[in-house]
């Protein structure tokens, strides 16, 4: 019996035929489909309806064997380590050719497409393979004619050197190692596949066996097993189509898509419940907003006021007291929560006597403003204010400067002189429409405002001590001093509001006659917000500076004076700091 020659492409075709998903039970809604060499086969009739004559029995047996052996595909994923190299040639696989077929391939003539074969001495006792399912039927003829020459088909990969060296030396005993060559572990798929392929040999292969025994005649049966299967199917009434679009079953695809969609979709919660949950979430947020609007009204109003007054926005906290036009309900809520203990004490005990500190004589006027019941009159009271407002967060205090012209006195009371009589003080406040009580500022014995109350001006960033502070003996502004400044002004504005509410807006002293909300102009508010002009101005460009030393340096830009000259390069500079920086260049050059 002659076996058909097998090579790599023919085996891949058989594997594609076996591993095709189209080898399934026949469907009632679609025709039977099979895959052959990358193309699908459309069977015009069901397999059960085909005639069962002797011509079709062989092809049906082939199909049944392929269908029944489909379960061996699962063994592909069960790969194990290589066994020891002792007698398991069935697991040999080189470039797609299984090892347990090397003995059967040795009995065949090489295919026309495969010109890579070699002559090797091969003993007949090595043809027995306990694991191979293929029968070597031509062994007796080959032994009687030529026992040392057989055609062995090799792959593109060279065989091991032990086999090649044994073949070149002519030693027959060394060729037995071919049965022990194992490169890759393979499954039972190849054995079953080739047993099916060997059963497809045509009837004329008997004469080819004799030619194979001589080792010189060409193979009569040149068709591969896959071609024989195709011919058998064609003779049984099977038509082969090339167009793959005719075999797409959209119904099955839709069913698979529906199954996948139902598996992916989250069906744990019904859609109606999801909608209810969304509504509950929205309602809960709406309830929270309503609760915030009802219980945090003062915080909202405070934010609005801060947005209107940009300069005070950096110094007013969300829980700080509000300006004069705040509602009385907000004031009561602040008092009830204990935010303003001093104001609450003042409202409960009443204002102090205005004549207690000022009196009627001019000798006592240095202790405070005469007739101003709201001004702080003692150091202990200032300490009390500092203790009450130490928890506020304000920027560090800085030195404040004012303008030289007398009109600036009504904006910033720092340079207000201590009045010698009440008439002069009243005229001064009536001219400017400004009151010390409204601003919440107090004067000291020399007429200068306390530095405790002058830390809320944004433009004052200098750290030097001015002459006015030197005269008053006040120390440099500290952080604690600025912390109590912001709330102190706000508290005294609340006191002014309460006084106007209790007294009906009636003035109690000659100075109070000038106090009214309409008496504040834009310039007055700018002074309160810290936008007053600097003290010293340039006589040429009218630019203001905080101290005179800055003006001297500034005047050099107009006059072109450069009194500081470098000793090395004779380059002149307006400021000494620039000269020192320039000298560093010469020092670096000298080191280099």
From Swiss-Prot:
Major location category of this protein: nucleus
Region described as Disordered: 114-156, 343-377, 416-439, 459-527
Leader sequence segment: none
Biological-process GO terms, alphabetical: gene expression involved in extracellular matrix organization; lumen formation, open tracheal system; negative regulation of transcription by RNA polymerase II; positive regulation of gene expression; positive regulation of transcription by RNA polymerase II; regulation of transcription by RNA polymerase II; trachea morphogenesis
Subcellular localization(s) per the UniProt record: Nucleus
GO molecular function: DNA-binding transcription activator activity, RNA polymerase II-specific; RNA polymerase II cis-regulatory region sequence-specific DNA binding; zinc ion binding
Xref: SUPFAM superfamilies: beta-beta-alpha zinc fingers
Any single Gene Ontology cellular-component annotation: nucleus
Keyword Repeat attached: yes
Protein origin, superkingdom: Eukaryota
Composition-biased stretches (Gly residues): 356-369
Low complexity bias spans: 124-148, 488-500
Keywords: Activator, DNA-binding, Metal-binding, Nucleus, Repeat, Transcription, Transcription regulation, Zinc, Zinc-finger
Zn-finger segments (C2H2-type): 536-558, 564-586
Phenotypic effect of disruption: Embryonic lethal. RNAi-mediated knockdown in the trachea of first instar larvae results in discontinuous tubes. RNAi-mediated knockdown in the tracheal terminal cells of first instar larva results in lumen devoid of taenidiae and occluded with disorganized electron-dense material, pan-tracheal liquid clearance defect as well as a breaks in the dorsal trunks.
Record field: compositional bias (Polar residues): 114-123, 459-469, 507-524
InterPro entries linked: C2H2-ZF_Transcription_Reg, Znf_C2H2_sf, Znf_C2H2_type
Free-text function comment from the UniProt entry: Transcriptional activator. In tracheal terminal cells, regulates the transcription of factors involved in the formation of a mature apical extracellular matrix (aECM) which is essential for the integrity and shape of seamless tubes.
Stated name of the protein: Ichor
Species assigned in the record: Drosophila melanogaster (Fruit fly)
